[in-house]
Amino acid sequence: GAFIMPGTLWCGAGNAASDYSQLGTEKDTDMCCRDHDHC
């Protein structure tokens, strides 16, 4: 599978979130990555 940074669902290749509102434990980092993924 794709590598996702620990503590995040959106940082890395693809994402591990089941829906857009879901975030990992590193929320600030994850929100930044999520914004990049949904440009």
From Swiss-Prot:
The taxonomy runs:
Eukaryota, Metazoa, Chordata, Craniata, Vertebrata
Which family does the record assign?
Belongs to the phospholipase A2 family. Group III subfamily.
Q: What does this protein do?
A: PLA2 catalyzes the calcium-dependent hydrolysis of the 2-acyl groups in 3-sn-phosphoglycerides.
Pfam families per the UniProt record, alphabetical: Phospholip_A2_2 (PF05826)
> Which of the seven top EC classes does this enzyme belong to?
hydrolase
Q: Where found?
A: Secreted
Which PANTHER family does this entry report, sorted A to Z? RH14732P
**Keyword terms, alphabetized:** Calcium, Hydrolase, Lipid degradation, Lipid metabolism, Secreted
An annotated GO cellular component? extracellular region
Q: What is this protein called?
A: Phospholipase A2
Catalytic activities: a 1,2-diacyl-sn-glycero-3-phosphocholine + H2O = a 1-acyl-sn-glycero-3-phosphocholine + a fatty acid + H(+)
